[in-house]
Amino acid sequence: MQRSFYEILGIESDASNIEIKRAYRAMLLETHPDKSGLNYNSNGNNTSSHSVTDIQEAYQTLIDQDLRKKYDEELAESFKKLGFHNAGDGLDLFSLDLFDYSGDEQSFSMNCPRCQITDGFQLTEDALEEHAIDYEGGGYFVLVQCSACSLWLKVLFDVMEE
């Protein structure tokens, strides 16, 4: 999954136009070869994670209120298709079924949908048993934070009887 425009500019989804403009200017300076001190490969290409085109597209979309509203709706829909739903309590719901399971380590892992860090969310079977909370819709849930960013998830699961 590619980074959102908010992540490209390094801002929160409720950022004001002033914050968007500041972030845009800062990101352009960060990618400018004479200003940034970033590394360039032998072809003269910037090796940073965002191109000027990405930064400009993010800015142009987020600074226009109509485009931003449409973008936010599309972003929310894309997260829903991935099984990522807002629970209304500020936490996003994910099913444990979407996590990768390692039988050797008896653990579940998933890349963070926000910062894209590999295995940003990790849960062991012991942690699930120890911290499980009854979920009003049936089954259980645990709260878990990404190891690299501030995103918290509510992970839903059922217990399989052996």
Swiss-Prot record:
Species, as recorded: Kluyveromyces lactis (strain ATCC 8585 / CBS 2359 / DSM 70799 / NBRC 1267 / NRRL Y-1140 / WM37) (Yeast)
PROSITE patterns registered for this protein in UniProt: DNAJ_2 (PS50076), DPH_MB (PS51074)
Domain DPH-type MB: 90-158
Residues reported in the UniProt entry to bind Zn(2+): 112, 115, 146, 149
Main function: Required for the first step of diphthamide biosynthesis, the transfer of 3-amino-3-carboxypropyl from S-adenosyl-L-methionine to a histidine residue. Diphthamide is a post-translational modification of histidine which occurs in elongation factor 2.
Pathway: Protein modification; peptidyl-diphthamide biosynthesis
InterPro entries linked to this entry: DnaJ_C/III_chloroplastic (IPR053232), DnaJ_domain (IPR001623), DPH_MB_dom (IPR007872), DPH_MB_sf (IPR036671), J_dom_sf (IPR036869)
Name of the protein: Diphthamide biosynthesis protein 4
Cross-referenced Pfam families: DnaJ, Zn_ribbon_CSL
Domain notes: The DPH-type metal-binding (MB) domain can bind either zinc or iron ions.
Gene Ontology CC annotations of this record: cytoplasm; nucleus
Gene Ontology MF term list: metal ion binding
